């Protein structure tokens, strides 16, 4: 059972249905270069710990938040990260705090999916939630590793200044996040 939930967590992140999560990771990580991989790993870990905490609290029905509201807040976290990228272009020390706060919101979003998955199951934190979250962390590390290496080599080509690349990618992601905000807000 452990390995099954580890796989589900891993592939849940890499699924096209989790595009909002992948775009969040993209704009969260794009400001880090290859030499800052340890800092990025800490940011991802803060995100995952917070994500895991809110996910567990929601799955165990300790907290309940309107799922439709959470679905609006998720793209809002993406938009805020894009705006942050436009303003600063480099990672800031408080990125780890923002990642943690945003992880709480994203975890609540995943909890709705998992509640459907766990219908009729006895929820055991160590057999279900822990491996699911480890799978999420592994997928995030894989995604961000590939991203950082691709961006590093793209930057070496000197086709465009890296700060402009950050702005262009952040702009496209910001537009998509605004579309999600409007669409999801209309569903509340």
Give residue ranges: language-model regions.
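Histidine-/acidic- and/or cysteine-rich, low-complexity loops and terminal segments associated
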Residues: 1-19, 91, 118, 178-188
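Juxtamembrane transmembrane-helix termini in multi-pass membrane transport proteins
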Residues: 9-58
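Structural signature of hydrophobic alpha-helical transmembrane segments
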Residues: 11-21, 65-74, 134-140
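Divalent metal-coordination and catalytic microenvironments
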Residues: 21, 51, 79, 104-106, ...
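Membrane interface segments of multi-pass transport proteins and intramembrane proteases
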Residues: 62-66, 86-90, 149-168
């Amino acid at each position: 059972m452990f390995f099954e939930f580890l796989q589900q967590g891993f592939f849940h992140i890499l699924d096209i249905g989790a595009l909002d999560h992948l775009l969040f990771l993209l704009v969260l990580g794009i400001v880090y270069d290859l030499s800052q991989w340890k800092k990025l790993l800490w940011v991802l870990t803060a995100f995952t710990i917070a994500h895991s905490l809110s996910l567990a609290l929601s799955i165990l029905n300790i907290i309940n938040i309107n799922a439709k509201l959470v679905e609006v807040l998720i793209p809002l976290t993406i938009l805020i990260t894009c705006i942050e990228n436009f303003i600063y272009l480099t990672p800031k020390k408080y990125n780890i705090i923002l990642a943690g706060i945003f992880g709480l919101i994203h975890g609540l979003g995943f909890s709705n999916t998992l509640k459907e998955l766990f219908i009729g199951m006895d929820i055991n934190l160590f057999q279900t939630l822990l491996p699911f979250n480890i799978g999420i962390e592994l997928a995030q590390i894989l995604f961000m590793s590939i991203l950082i290496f691709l961006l590093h080599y793209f930057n070496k080509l000197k086709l465009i200044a890296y700060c402009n690349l950050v702005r262009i990618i952040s702009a496209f992601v910001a537009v998509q996040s605004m579309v999600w905000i409007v669409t999801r807000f209309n569903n509340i």
